[in-house]
Amino acid sequence: MKFSKIFVFVFAIVFATASVSAAPGNFFKDLEKMGQRVRDAVISAAPAVDTLAKAKALGQG
């Protein structure tokens, strides 16, 4: 009986450690990549926004 409790406990510990991702620094890399994507999207959208602003000014003026 005692052996089965120890076996279940060891199995639970092994399962818990196998299912946990051990990369806490990876979150910050993903966050940095997301920020870079947003920055790149804003930079690439700038010419389109300028064109729309010029078209709006042309239409009003």
Swiss-Prot record:
Induction pattern: By bacterial infection.
Propeptide: 23-24
Modified-residue entries (Glutamine amide), positions: 60
InterPro entries referenced in this protein's UniProt entry, alphabetically: Cecropin (IPR000875)
Keywords linked to the UniProt accession: Amidation, Antibiotic, Antimicrobial, Immunity, Innate immunity, Secreted, Signal
Signal peptide location: 1-22
Residue spans crossing the bilayer: none
Tissue expression: Mainly in fat body. Lower in hemocytes. Not expressed in midguts, malpighian tubules and silk glands.
Compartment annotation: Secreted
A Pfam family hit: Cecropin
Gene Ontology annotations of biological process type: antibacterial humoral response; defense response to Gram-positive bacterium; innate immune response
Main localization (coarse): secreted
One GO cellular component term: extracellular region
Lineage: superkingdom: Eukaryota
Biological function: Cecropins have lytic and antibacterial activity against several Gram-positive and Gram-negative bacteria.
Similarity field: Belongs to the cecropin family.
Name of this chain's protein: Cecropin-D
Gene symbol of the encoding locus: CECD
